[in-house]
Amino acid sequence: MKLFNICLVIFTTLLSPTLLSAEINSGDTAWILTATALVLFMTLPGLALFYGGLVRNQNILSVLMQCFAICCIVSVIWVIYGYSLAFTGAGSIIGGTDALFLSSLMRESASGTLPESLFVVFQMTFAVITPALVVGAFAERMKFSAMCIFTVLWVTLVYLPACHMVWGGGYLGSIGVIDFAGGLVVHATCGIGALVAAMMLGPRKGFPGGSLVPHNRPMAVSYTHLTLPTKRIV
């Protein structure tokens, strides 16, 4: 229902007569709409299936709920202050507060050749999938409540500054750093975060020597087939 409401807002905005201007490119808009859906699809059900298939049977629901919870938590963060800190303001490390609660978002707002509302949701999908990728590093070893706290802190202290510095007009962007597909903002940040989390938590109970066989390999492999079209966006 939440995803449906977001999509409804986007399409209502796109159909507004005020957007029928030279600034908005219909081809760019259609493609970014498609890319937005595909990136979200990589997280739910993509990553949920992948990590769920690799853990033991007794932990599958825990991993699935972590992926779903991250999607919900980051979506709320993005609307309240995430987009504002990532894409507004002239700070070199972090953005400003001009768009808290998306207060600056108008029906006629544009970001390049796209409606700004679409740009907000597109960038939100990357903010969602990045901490979700870290789940694999602490699977079966972190409580749900701890994961929620970790997600809020990690997105706020790591992802948002990195996003602003590269994509939001911050320091790295000003010195010529280019990241078209998220190699730095997404993959580098979540990779380092996953490494630190794994080192802090240590190995799973029973490793080595215990039975840690994935409970459903076909379920994990299905993620690869489901997301092959998605990889085309990069």
Question: What kind of feature is each model-predicted range?
Answer:
Residues 225, 231-234:
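Single conserved hydrophobic/aromatic residue that forms the stacking wall/gate
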Residues 3-12, 16-226:
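Hydrophobic alpha-helical transmembrane bundles of multi-pass membrane proteins
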Residues 1-4, 230-232:
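Generic cytosolic/nucleocytoplasmic N-terminal low-complexity/intrinsically disordered segments
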